[in-house]
């Protein structure tokens, strides 16, 4: 193997375990011809939704075993729906108890996502399309779209025009329409008013809603979902895709035997959660307009849902053909060639043939493989070539792998003493130059904190070497994220059972009710109140919470559910900033430096948040060195959570560390 071949093969890194947010990314490796019957059914459902402005078609259930391509399929659906002038929303159903809160949060998140091929978000697109329908003056339309300063007069003129176009929708949905315009404004105060409205919260300041023509009384989440759907329906069809049902059901420990879902000895908590999920799925069609609901899950999950709700759910959903194996040698070859061609081009390498070193004749055996199994088998061969420093042509695939390995990570390259010194110097230089005030400002936290936290979590994973392979970090969130980062640990690949550590920064310059709104959004997105112990939420804040009754109640519920508030100091921000730049500059030997120096040990808030990680793993890797806990903004120590079952069943959370004195409240 020469140097050019070695470098080219090293670029062939497959990630066969996508996370839900990958649905929003471009699809550079998509190959036409995969799951054609299912895509055809979904697009037919979208056409049906588009043709009926006052109702929604039957929902669709897309079933496939893990690795069959459900997440990739949702990405294809998202792309094609948006190309047909429709809207797409992805609901990560992590908590059946807050079904409508979760659907609403997903719709708001989806509205803040950019439309492919433009810098315009789905929200901006919706407001632009609505503006084109109404007869309001151009100045009012531009203000509502966020292009110019929003005023009450402009908003009133827009609603008058909407009423002329569709009086019923304008009368029913006017408050939500006004909140959408406020959320598109460049003024953060306007956005705070909208955010609190969408959380069904009380007014932050008496009379602030009346100043924009809105009633003071909070509007329930289900009604806001209906409003959003009706407004969207005025301009085009929508798809609401529901994912992560398998992860939720896996917490019930009945995935291995769906018959238990109908058993008389199922616990009341299990039965209640399943009933709430089924009720929400059934009501979604009645609540929405021109909206196709797509439920993506493994077959066992659908069996469990159907058995819980008798025949009622099945009456409102139709099953698509199941996602199958590849069943086509040409399609299998195209899947690999598409990936290899892009990577080889990036490396400046011209292979002997597009699928090199996998012989075209090897794909004759690919019919029995799922797309993920094919990637796993070929990745195994590539790793063996690199390990032996010898290129061997792969001429046969053999049998599909029965066990799924973790997504591969490049082995650490031992850094020389000179390289270690160079990295040490670069790290020190970047720490010194870091911005330690901007990331926690109210106006910039949503933009600055996600990449910083992602860098810290990614470095933490890389420091663990092989023990980090079970972990993943969610891709960058939307521009208006409820969470700033999420670390996932997969406990069971088959059922997709996972543990999540979620993070959200809430700057000290947020006034009390704005901070409260962000706390509530983060709790919904993290599914903190599931009671499973598998969902953890850490709010990063250096100042004490407001002492208002509403905030005290919310913080108390947050803490009782296991949530913690952690301080972030200047040194934490310096380390995160340095790691972000170094990972962007990454070379092959950076992981060697990370594994040796382990800079995330200096992140006090992260060491505290992840103190219980090794209780969930069988191969925990090196134990973290003791560190002082991050300062907490609450004056009193956090209560220690109730004891959990033993690690074999469900690990007990680590005891809360002592907390430092709090900064005074704003």
Name each model feature, range by range:
Residues 1-12, 187-357, 560-589, 593-596:
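The catalytic "switch" region of P-loop NTPases
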Residues 38-46, 225, 264-281, 511-524, ...:
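Well-ordered, non-membrane alpha-helical segments in soluble/globular domains
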Residues 51-54, 81-83, 230-234, 283-290, ...:
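Conserved catalytic network of the ASCE P-loop NTPase/AAA+ motor domain
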Residues 55-238, 415-455, 461-472:
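P-loop NTPase nucleotide-binding core
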Residues 66-69, 246-254, 268-269, 300-303, ...:
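Short acidic, S/G/P-rich loop/turn micro-motifs used as interaction or catalytic elements
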Residues 312-313, 327-358, 362-369, 373, ...:
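Extended alpha-helical interface modules used as scaffolds for assembling large macromolecular complexes
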């Amino acid at each position: 193997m020469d140097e050019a071949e070695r470098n080219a093969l090293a670029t062939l890194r497959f990630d066969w375990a996508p996370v839900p947010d990958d649905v929003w990314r471009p699809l550079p490796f998509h190959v036409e011809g995969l799951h054609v019957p299912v895509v055809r059914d979904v697009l037919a459902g979208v056409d049906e939704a588009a043709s009926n402005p006052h109702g929604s078609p039957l929902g669709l259930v897309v079933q496939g075993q893990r690795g069959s391509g459900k997440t990739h399929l949702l990405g294809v659906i998202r792309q094609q729906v948006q190309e047909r002038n429709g809207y797409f929303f992805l609901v990560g159903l992590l908590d059946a108890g807050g079904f409508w809160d979760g659907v609403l949060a997903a719709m708001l998140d989806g509205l803040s996502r950019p439309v492919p091929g433009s810098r315009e978000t789905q929200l901006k697109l919706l407001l632009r399309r609505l503006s084109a329908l109404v007869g309001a003056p151009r100045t009012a339309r531009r203000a509502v779209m966020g292009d110019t300063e929003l005023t009450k007069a402009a908003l009133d003129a827009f609603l008058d025009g909407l009423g002329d176009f569709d009086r019923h929708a304008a009368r029913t949905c006017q408050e939500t329409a006004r909140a959408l315009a406020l959320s598109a404004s460049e003024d953060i105060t306007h956005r705070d008013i909208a955010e609190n409205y969408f959380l069904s919260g009380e007014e932050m300041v008496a009379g602030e809603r009346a100043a924009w023509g809105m009633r003071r009384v909070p509007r329930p989440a289900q009604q806001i979902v209906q409003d959003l759907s009706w407004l969207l329906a005025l301009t085009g069809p929508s798809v609401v895709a529901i994912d992560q049902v398998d992860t939720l059901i896996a917490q019930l420990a009945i995935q291995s035997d769906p018959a238990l879902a109908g058993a008389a000895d199922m616990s009341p908590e299990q039965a209640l959660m399943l009933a709430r999920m089924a009720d929400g799925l059934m009501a979604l069609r009645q609540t929405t307009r021109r909206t196709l609901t797509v439920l993506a899950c493994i077959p066992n999950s659908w069996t469990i849902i159907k058995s819980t709700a008798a025949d009622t759910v099945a009456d409102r959903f139709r099953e698509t053909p199941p996602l199958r194996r590849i069943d086509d040698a040409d399609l299998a070859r195209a899947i690999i060639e598409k990936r290899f061609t892009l990577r080889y081009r990036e490396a400046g390498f011209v292979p002997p043939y597009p699928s090199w070193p996998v012989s075209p004749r090897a794909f004759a055996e690919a019919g029995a493989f799922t797309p993920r199994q094919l990637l796993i088998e070929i990745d195994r061969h590539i790793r063996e070539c690199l390990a032996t420093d010898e290129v061997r042509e792969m001429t046969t695939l053999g049998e599909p792998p029965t066990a799924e390995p973790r997504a591969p990570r490049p082995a650490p390259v031992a850094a020389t003493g000179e390289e270690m010194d160079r990295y040490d110097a670069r790290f020190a230089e970047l720490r010194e130059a870091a911005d330690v005030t901007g990331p926690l400002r109210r106006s910039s936290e949503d933009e600055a904190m996600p990449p910083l936290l992602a860098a810290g979590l990614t470095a933490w994973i890389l420091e663990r070497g092989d023990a980090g392979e079970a972990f993943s970090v969610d891709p960058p969130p939307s521009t208006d994220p409820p969470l700033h980062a999420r670390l996932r640990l997969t406990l069971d690949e088959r059922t997709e059972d996972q543990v999540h550590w979620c993070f959200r920064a809430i700057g000290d310059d947020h006034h009390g009710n704005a901070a409260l709104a962000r706390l509530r959004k983060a709790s919904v997105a993290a599914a903190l109140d599931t009671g499973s112990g598998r969902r953890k939420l850490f709010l990063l804040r250096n100042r004490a919470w407001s002492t208002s009754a509403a905030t005290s109640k919310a913080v108390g519920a947050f803490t009782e559910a296991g949530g913690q508030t952690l301080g972030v100091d200047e040194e934490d921000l310096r380390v995160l900033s340095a790691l972000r730049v170094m990972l962007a500059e990454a070379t092959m030997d950076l992981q060697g430096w990370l594994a040796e120096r382990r800079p995330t040990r200096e992140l006090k808030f992260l060491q505290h948040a992840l103190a219980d990680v090794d209780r969930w793993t069988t191969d925990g890797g090196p134990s973290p060195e003791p560190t002082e806990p991050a300062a907490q903004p609450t004056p009193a120590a956090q209560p220690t959570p109730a004891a959990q079952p033993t690690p074999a069943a469900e690990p007990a959370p680590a005891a809360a560390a002592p907390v430092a004195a709090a900064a005074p409240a704003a």
